């Protein structure tokens, strides 16, 4: 009975996210999405003179300097853009001191980005990862793929609770054969991933979306508190009223931001 109730609650949660994200994506965010990522799935076509209303970011300053007139780069659109939503489902994302956990925040972002991409006519894919890739849905068009992505973000259990952002980047390097737009959703509590993430960003358009909980930025001085790492299982009692302990916690928090 509890399992049935849990499934029903999960489906209601997916439905609420779908309704909210559809509204935001169609009424508020779709124009910003199209404007922000125009060019991510485009091929260069030719140069032409700047006209009022053209986007300034497409101005080619080298050609402008040579011609003494303002020129922009004109693009021709590829058949479609592949959008990959990458979500960290490691143990640390189950934490949340407010109404929603970081995992549930990730589901909200997945819904918003997924439906925005769908309304823009783009394909949407999903990669869930922890220590390694846990689930990969290849890019496809249609709302059903977005709804499934939301459901998987909320329900998929990691094979290992630890985090390896580098393993996710390496998987994408091998799996994506064409330039894609990648939304990378994580709390980025990991070490030594900067090089592989930077290499991925050289081949694709990567947008990092950081999941941050207020308690991870500032812990109140409330005396002795037992902390447990949800990924390693290590636990320790810390006196949060101790100034040295507060300094150490603040330093650790800044390390991951």
Question: Which residues make up each language-model segment?
Answer:
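Von Willebrand factor type A / integrin I
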Residues: 1-36, 42, 46, 54-55, ...
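Acidic, polar low-complexity linker/tail segments
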Residues: 12-85, 89-97
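DG-centered beta-turn motif at the end of beta-strands
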Residues: 61, 87-90, 126, 172, ...
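…and closely analogous acidic/polar surface helices at protein-protein or active-site interfaces
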Residues: 76, 93-123
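Short glycine-/polar-rich loops that comprise or flank the Walker A/P-loop
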Residues: 80-81, 121-122, 179-180, 202-205
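A short, flexible beta-alpha/helix-coil linker loop
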Residues: 90-94, 131-134, 243-245
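Short beta-strand-loop
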Residues: 123-152
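Von Willebrand factor
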Residues: 145-180, 192, 213
């Amino acid at each position: 009975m509890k399992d049935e109730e849990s499934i029903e609650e999960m489906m209601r949660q997916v439905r609420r996210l779908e309704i909210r994200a559809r509204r935001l994506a169609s009424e508020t965010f779709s124009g910003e999405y199209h404007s922000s990522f125009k060019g991510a799935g485009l091929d260069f076509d030719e140069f032409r003179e700047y006209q009022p209303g053209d986007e300034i970011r497409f101005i080619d300053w080298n050609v402008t300097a040579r011609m003494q007139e303002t020129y922009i780069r004109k693009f021709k659109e590829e058949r479609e853009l592949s959008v990959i939503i990458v979500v960290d489902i490691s143990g640390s994302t189950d934490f949340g001191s407010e109404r929603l956990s970081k995992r549930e925040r990730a589901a909200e972002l997945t819904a918003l980005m997924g439906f925005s991409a769908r309304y823009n006519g783009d394909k949407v894919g999903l990669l869930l990862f922890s220590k390694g890739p846990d689930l990969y849905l290849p890019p496809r068009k249609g709302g059903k793929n977005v709804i499934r992505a939301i459901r998987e973000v909320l329900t998929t259990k990691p094979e290992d609770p630890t985090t390896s952002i580098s393993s996710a980047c390496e998987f994408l390097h091998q799996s994506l054969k064409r330039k894609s737009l990648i939304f990378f959703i994580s709390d980025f509590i990991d070490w030594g991933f900067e090089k592989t993430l930077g290499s991925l960003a050289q081949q694709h358009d990567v947008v990092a979306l950081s999941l941050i909980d207020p308690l991870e930025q500032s812990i109140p001085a409330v005396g002795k508190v037992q902390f447990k790492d949800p990924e390693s299982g290590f636990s320790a009692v810390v006196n949060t009223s101790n100034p040295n302990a507060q300094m150490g916690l603040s330093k650790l928090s800044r390390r991951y931001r």
